[in-house]
Design a protein with these regions (language model features):
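Phosphate-ester processing/binding pockets and catalytic centers
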Residues: 1-239
């Protein structure tokens, strides 16, 4: 059963907030440049069920002779479910799992990189850009003063607990005005391989990214009812 009055939030990203490389070389329109930053989250009150579903999936792959000879599952003892690196057959099976998995809702924010916005709003600072997008993701989401929110941010790049705290505090300022109460929360930054629940939002973001960058919508369409919001900050909604 879900834990009373506890909500778990798992946050991940795809792409990066970087515009410049070594010696301040502008990377826009060069090979390897990531044109978008995606940050997404899932909310659940039944963390144990989600975790069990992912862990059971990993164990079933390792025990199945049809899949356990795939190199990524045999050469990497720390293998975990990760959309970009997973074998297509494993990826398809995990999407099937997600189609039938309940007990969570997803939110995604898409930020197309715009150099003018980066210069004007984010002071040429990729960290400011990242946490501004994170603020948009969290804004208006954590509203129940009777809940204890537990937020887990996937450990990537220059993520820091201090900046995470700032982004959450900024998002909660407006929320607390609306709710006339103090929102209770805990924060933690953790590696994806140590938190199986993060694989769920990783796959949900991969589906959005695939639709946007490759024009392949079948993954997104298969999970469409799992997305509560998909916010495209600078362009039209993709839904």
């Amino acid at each position: 059963m879900p834990e009373a009055n506890k909500v778990y939030v798992f946050i991940d990203e795809s792409g990066d907030p970087v515009y410049y490389g070594n010696r301040k070389k502008l990377l826009v329109d060069t090979d390897g440049f990531q044109p978008y930053l995606f940050i997404g989250m899932i909310e659940t009150s039944d963390r144990k069920a989600l975790r069990k579903a992912v862990v059971d999936f990993i164990e079933s792959i390792r025990e199945d002779s049809l899949y356990n000879s795939i190199p990524s599952t045999t050469t990497n003892k720390g293998w975990y479910v990760h959309a970009r690196g997973d074998h297509p057959e494993i990826r398809a099976k995990f999407f099937e799992l997600l189609r039938n998995l309940d007990g969570y809702k997803a939110h995604i924010v898409i930020a197309k990189k715009d150099l003018n916005i980066f210069n004007r709003k984010h002071n040429n600072n990729p960290t400011e850009f990242y946490f501004d997008v994170l603020h948009h993701l969290l804004n208006g989401r954590l509203l129940n003063v009777d809940c204890q929110y537990n937020l887990y941010l996937s450990q990537r790049g220059n993520n820091s607990l201090h900046r995470f705290q700032q982004a959450v505090d900024k998002a909660l300022e407006a929320n607390e005005i609306k709710t006339h109460g103090k929102i209770k929360y805990n924060l933690e930054i953790i590696a994806s391989k140590e938190m199986p629940e993060l694989s769920i939002i990783d796959y949900l973001m991969w589906a959005v990214q695939r639709k946007l960058l490759k024009g392949e919508s079948r993954y997104f369409d298969a999970l469409k009812d799992k997305y509560e919001t998909v916010l495209n900050l600078y362009e039209e909604d993709i839904k």
